[in-house]
UniProtKB/Swiss-Prot annotation:
CC cofactor: FMN
NCBIfam families: sensory_box
Domain named PAS: residues: 7-80, 200-273
Protein name from the UniProt record: Phototropin
Span list, region Disordered: 563-591, 729-749
Cofactor note: Binds 2 FMN per subunit.
Domain AGC-kinase C-terminal: 713-749
Source organism: Chlamydomonas reinhardtii
Main subcellular localisation: membrane
Single GO biological process annotation from the record: blue light signaling pathway
A GO MF label: protein serine kinase activity
Composition skew (Low complexity), residue ranges: 734-749
UniProt xrefs under Gene3D superfamilies: PAS domain (3.30.450.20), Phosphorylase Kinase, domain 1 (3.30.200.20), Transferase(Phosphotransferase) domain 1 (1.10.510.10)
Domain Protein kinase: 404-712
Length: 749
């Protein structure tokens, strides 16, 4: 303890109010001794202040601690960087526990590291632990170490780091640039601004996690049909930790009183790939017996083969007078049928949500992606880029990476990198999206990639991104796409005073986005990830909707023309369409304008999904409630988009994800006092952000219902792409793309 300074009184005062488990080490002293430890740290480890302060944190290590993970921490400290690892640590009494440790440096304004903050989260019951190592070859459906870093550690680390920064007299957010290196899902600087870091979309793994049911998922394509996912409720019921469950067959729940005939029925159903509901006596880890109304349901792939088995457990045990005796079954037949129905409904919900997570079982899941140049589509008939690429393909047989020269990186998303590339020997530029095949398979994102590829191949619209070709190597996929000089609408928004646009400009962008969404719905697609980051600005200034990996592609649309008479789609008044005969539907001219004014094009997908996907601030209430959702989620997101473009923030954003969700579900819509917005615009937003999906504008007749709203009066829908955009990027501008361009590309806005 000699020579180790006591923690500053201000540090102790500030940190004492935090209930998290963490320590603070002094980076200016040899061996980085601990100068502060929270009460939570003492409680978790069993050590006292005299045994902790002045020592390095390595006293928590033991025989099972992985030296490779320890080396990651040492390397990060040496470089002054952040890192996040999962370590097997030991309490003072020798009890091992899994510790999700996140180390974050605190830097002074001159860039010198003064402190290291180490946040610990006991994830023993949540992590997969050694399941991967002990059951080699068992691919887990959800990688929990990554999920815990993103969903549990991130907010705790933010709380502690900001508190230490304040105590150190450092402007909050100074450490964040370094902290972004840690795999916590937080990218870019923290701050108080609504868009201080990119909003990462929630994926299909979140769907499974959020299903509030007692269930597990097994993979029949692997020997002995091992469990690859177990819900928290399943772990609570059985008393097992996730590490003890993953990679094992479900038979460990059987015991002395389990009926062998019932077990044989389950085995036969697995062999046949059929659905089954039975009542079986199971046992918890502690040996307590319980009646389990067990439903087994196959989740099939596109070929009809069972890709996963969902096992739903419903505890139907009556209160037993003696915990030592097996419970007696005394339910009536009607009660038993009701419980069985409950399990079957839950299994159906889970299977539906899982559809998007089933990666192809073929040896090469990427075989469906063609390497040839896409067919030339009508809206690109005169595109010089198509012509140049076709000539190269005819000359060399196929497109190769050698045909392109990398100019610079445009951005990095959740599943890949985007580079600006130039075709060798020409001035033609493209955006190349690169994905690591192995990472996509490891993270269960193959289905997402295939969905995006299929949608890009199918669409042809002036307000949607264009895919020219896909180049495959042994390790990577490269999507060669149309390059947009203006970058993201997100960048334009951030470059404006107070991060907001003029109402007439918002109307222009909203009308083009609405038209793009209408086209996607016409093809049976639900977009599901609308936000400024996914709206690109073409060199002409018009929008291009991009990123379709979270879209729902299993719906279908049967377009029909319906006579509306005197009652219109919006607000009970007849839609006011321009005199052009094609302006209402965006289609070709047929018949007189007078005739078409009395008809409406209905083209909404008959789609019903349960996946929990999208960006949290833009999620519709029905997505959060897991009640199943359809195309109306896109109209909710359109309302959020219009609100954000006008006010510079989203209406329901909270400090935490769960707070945001709570606001979306329960809080009323409130408009800021500034800037002044027209009554028609506020009315449109209110009607789009109706929490009852059945009453939401657009839920009855789709996009035309929204187009007929008074706020869009005067928009010539048929000639949108020929109108002058509010901002036209300079093609010679060096600030070529992505949100990294700042405001440099928007000087002429």
């Amino acid at each position: 303890m000699a020579g180790v300074p006591a923690p500053a009184s201000q540090l102790t005062k500030v940190l004492a109010g935090l209930r998290h488990t963490f320590v603070v080490a002094d980076a200016t002293l040899p061996d980085c001794p601990l100068v502060y430890a929270s009460e939570g740290f003492y409680a978790m480890t069993g050590y006292g202040p005299d045994e902790v302060l002045g020592h390095n944190c390595r006293f928590l290590q033991g025989e099972g601690t992985d030296p490779k993970e320890v080396q990651k921490i040492r390397d990060a400290i040496k470089k002054g960087e952040a890192c996040s690892v999962r370590l097997l640590n030991y309490r003072k009494d020798g009890t091992p526990f899994w510790n999700l440790l996140t180390v974050t440096p605190i830097k002074t304004p001159d860039g010198r590291v003064s402190k290291f903050v180490g946040v610990q989260v006991d994830v023993t019951s949540k992590t997969e632990g050694k399941a991967l190592a002990d059951n080699s070859g068992v691919p887990l459906l959800v990688k929990y170490d990554h999920r815990l870093r993103d969903n549990v550690a991130r907010t705790i680390v933010d709380d502690v780091t900001i508190a230490v920064e304040k105590a150190e007299g450092v402007e909050p957010g100074q450490a964040s640039a370094v902290a972004a290196a840690a795999p916590l899902g937080a990218k870019g600087p923290r701050g108080t601004a609504p868009k201080s870091f990119p909003r990462v979309a929630l994926d299909l793994a979140t769907t499974v996690e959020r299903i509030q049911q007692n269930f597990c998922i097994s993979d029949p394509t692997l020997p002995d049909c091992p469990i690859v996912f177990a819900s928290d409720a399943f772990l609570e019921l059985t008393g097992y930790s996730r590490e003890e469950v993953l990679g094992r067959n479900c038979r460990f729940l059987q015991g002395a009183g389990t009926d062998r005939g019932t077990v044989d029925q389950i085995r036969a159903a697995i062999k046949e790939g059929s659905e089954l509901t039975v009542r079986i006596l199971n046992y918890t880890k502690a040996g307590k017996a319980f009646w389990n109304m067990f439903t087994l349901a196959p989740m099939r792939d596109q070929d009809g083969h069972a890709r996963f088995f969902v096992g739903v457990q419903v505890d139907v045990t009556a209160q037993s007078t003696s915990p030592d005796k097996a419970p007696v079954w005394n339910k009536t037949p009607e009660e038993e049928v009701a419980k069985a129905k409950m399990g079957a409904e839950a299994a159906s919900l889970i299977s539906s949500a899982l559809q998007g997570m089933a990666a192809p079982t073929t040896a090469n899941p990427w075989a469906a992606i063609s390497g040839v140049i896409m067919r030339r589509k009508p809206h690109k008939a005169d595109d010089k880029a198509y012509q140049a690429l076709l000539q190269l393909q005819e000359r060399d047989g196929k497109m190769k990476l050698m045909h392109f020269r990398r100019v610079k990186q445009l951005g990095a998303g959740d599943v890949g990198l985007v580079d600006l590339v130039q075709l060798q020997g020409s001035e033609l530029k493209f955006a190349m999206k690169t994905l690591d095949k192995f990472e996509m398979q490891e993270r269960n994102k193959v289905a997402r990639v295939l969905t995006e590829s299929a949608i890009l191949a199918a669409v042809d619209h002036p307000f949607l991104a264009t895919l020219y070709c896909t180049i495959q190597t042994d390790t990577h996929l490269h999507f060669v796409m149309e390059y947009c000089d203006g970058g993201e609408l997100y960048g334009l928004l951030n470059s404006q005073p107070k991060k907001r646009l003029k109402e007439e400009h918002v109307r222009f962008y909203a009308s083009e986005v609405l038209t793009a969404l209408q086209y996607l719905h016409l093809l049976g697609y639900v977009y599901r990830d609308l936000k400024p980051e996914n709206i690109l600005l073409h060199h002409t200034g018009h929008v291009l909707l991009t990123d379709f990996d979270l879209s729902y592609s299993k719906g279908s649309t049967t377009p029909r023309i319906e006579k509306i008479g005197g009652a219109g789609a919006a607000g009970g008044s007849a839609p006011k369409s321009p005199k052009k005969s094609s302006s209402k539907s965006g289609g070709s001219s047929s018949g007189s304008a007078l005739q078409l004014e009395n008809y409406l094009l209905l083209a909404e997908p008959s789609a019903r999904a349960n996946s929990f996907v999208g960006t949290e601030e833009y999620l519709a209430p029905e997505v959060i409630n897991a009640a199943g959702h359809g195309p109306a989620v896109d109209w909710w997101s359109l309302g959020i988009l219009i609100f954000e473009l006008l006010y510079g923030t989203t209406p329901f954003r909270g400090a935490r994800r769960d707070e945001t969700f709570e606001n979306i579900i329960k809080s009323p819509l409130k408009f800021p006092s500034k800037p002044a917005v027209s009554e028609e615009c506020r009315d449109l937003i209110e009607k789009l952000l109706v929490k009852d999906v059945g009453a939401r504008l657009g839920s009855r007749t789709g996009a035309n219902e929204i187009k007929s709203h008074p706020w869009f009066k005067g928009i010539n829908w048929a000639l949108l792409r020929h109108q002058q955009p509010p901002y036209v990027p300079r093609r010679a501008s060096k600030a070529a793309g992505g949100s990294s361009t700042g405001g440099a590309a928007f000087d002429n806005y």
